[in-house]
């Protein structure tokens, strides 16, 4: 599969072609707001109140779930609750004094589905009654410990650090995934219950969003849920859009 990507004079992604077929088109306002995106349709914003936050999308192709996500944040702007009432799903997150994630708990109808404990590149995940410890090591190695046994796997990533496949010590593929230009993931194999993916971040597939530690990202919209408090590139006008993802150039930058 050969893809070709087009950009405007502000280095923003405006088109994706698969062969000769255009599979995605994106248009922008001068301030970096997405106005149209294939698969979503037209975007609306409130120019008077939070002018960079999406208020409504057309959902032209019906790819956006009809249920509503409720979110709440702590005093430091970190996500502490995600709730999808339509699916009866709820995720609570806790943080340490340095505002690094300590844990998250996913539940449905008050019944626990998955509990995760975080400590840097270590995760302890309890899911379906099974506890696994994940160690993300240098050189794209992943050590997974379960029932006292540790197995070593090798992850293969793209230039952005997105995990494309994982193989075990015998060379057997145990994970396989692909991503569109904005990070929407398609998983075709996952024998190790891996929850990381796009740019190495945690995929919250139950909510169709990505937890990028600091903020939540929607790969369908190509926008963040909350604003960025920092302007890293003050000489770039697009960096003042506090909800845009990577200056609207998702194939070049990571968050």
Annotate the PLM regions.
Residues 86, 122, 202-203, 216:
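Short, flexible loop/turn elements at secondary-structure junctions
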Residues 233-238:
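Short linker/helix segments within small regulatory modules
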Residues 204, 231-232:
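Short histidine/acidic/glycine/proline-rich micro-motifs that form metal-
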């Amino acid at each position: 599969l050969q893809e070709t990507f087009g950009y405007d004079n502000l280095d923003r992604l405006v088109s994706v072609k698969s062969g000769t077929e255009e599979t995605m088109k994106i248009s922008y306002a001068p301030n970096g707001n997405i106005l149209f995106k294939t698969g979503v349709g037209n975007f609306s914003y409130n120019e008077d109140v939070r002018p960079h936050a999406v208020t409504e999308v057309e959902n032209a192709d019906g790819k956006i779930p009809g249920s509503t996500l409720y979110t709440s944040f702590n005093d430091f702007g970190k996500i502490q609750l995600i709730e999808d009432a339509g699916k009866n799903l709820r995720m609570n997150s806790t943080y340490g004094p340095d505002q690094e994630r300590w844990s998250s708990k996913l539940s449905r109808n008050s019944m626990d589905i998955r509990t995760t404990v975080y400590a840097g590149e270590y995760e302890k995940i309890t899911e379906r009654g099974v506890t696994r410890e994940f160690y993300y090591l240098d050189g794209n190695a992943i050590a997974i410990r379960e029932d006292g046994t540790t197995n070593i796997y090798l992850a293969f990533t793209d230039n952005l650090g997105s995990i494309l496949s994982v193989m075990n010590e015998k060379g057997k593929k145990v994970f396989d995934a692909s991503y569109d230009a904005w990070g929407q993931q398609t998983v075709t194999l996952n024998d190790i219950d891996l929850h990381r993916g796009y740019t190495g971040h945690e995929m919250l597939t139950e909510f169709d969003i990505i937890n990028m530690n600091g903020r939540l990202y929607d790969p369908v919209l190509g926008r963040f849920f909350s604003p960025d408090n920092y302007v890293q590139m003050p000489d770039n006008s697009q960096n003042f859009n506090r909800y845009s993802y990577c200056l609207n150039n998702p194939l070049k930058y990571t968050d």
